[in-house]
Amino acid sequence: MTDDKPTLVSQLAGAGLDRREARWLVEEFYDDPVALEAAQKRRLSGEPLQYVLGHWPFRSLDLDLDERVLIPRPESEELVDVALTELAKNDAVTPLLLDVGCGSGAIGLSLLAELGNRGLRASLVALDVSPDALALSRENARKHQLHAVTFVASDWFSELDPSFRGRFDLIVANPPYVSEVAFTELDPVLSYEPRDALVAPDASGVGGFADVQRIIRDAPQWLGPSGVLVLEHGYDQGEAALRACRDAGYRDVRDLEDLAGHPRVLVARP
């Protein structure tokens, strides 16, 4: 840091900001004192740092972020790792990917970028029911010059072109899976994020399970012969997810634990 940046960091820290966060804000808004003051107020009011900065790293990508989309979680980086591992088993040179509920584009765009770095000519279909989320995902695709993307406004699979049936090598999803009851008990900072990206109705006696169940049920008709579904679910939804897979006729199903030891990522092949 140069010039008066250390002084500014100390001032922000003295006002109540975490010193590391103060350093990030100074680096981001150093050339605009008015914006720096506004950012300080936003963060002190409880707004997530990622929204205040307007961008945040996710794997190899620096993603633009704001209140239109959910802030990507570390668990979703694990989801990408699992998806890459499973996709490698298919030996597809030009894999076709579907990101169901793409949000900021974090998962699908990361897959597209990393597969490209491995020399694979992947194509991505990214769908979301939120026009705002799709707009931001498009912005992130342009930012990182990821052009092999088709964006679709759709409530899960409902508006997906029928020509895609039986073609996807990978369907990846991080749907809402928090129940109404659990949402009221979460950190208040989550009130800044789009509620519909977090909360789902109950299903089959399981809180917040409706969207997970629907994706498990409908995904097989869109997967290719060697295709795989990789889906993140709630830590307490593992048994229900496995049961839903059995009901939907999947032949190869695993539920992987996250870093905290909770069942978190479902891997299923029809």
Q: Which residues make up each language-model segment?
A:
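Conserved SAM/SAH cofactor-binding pocket of Class I
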Residues: 78-184, 214
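C-terminal beta-strand of the catalytic ATP-binding
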Residues: 177, 269-270
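Conserved Class I SAM-dependent methyltransferase catalytic core
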Residues: 206-268
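Conserved beta-strand segments of alpha/beta enzyme cores
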Residues: 62, 123, 148-150, 251-254
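Conserved AdoMet
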Residues: 20-86
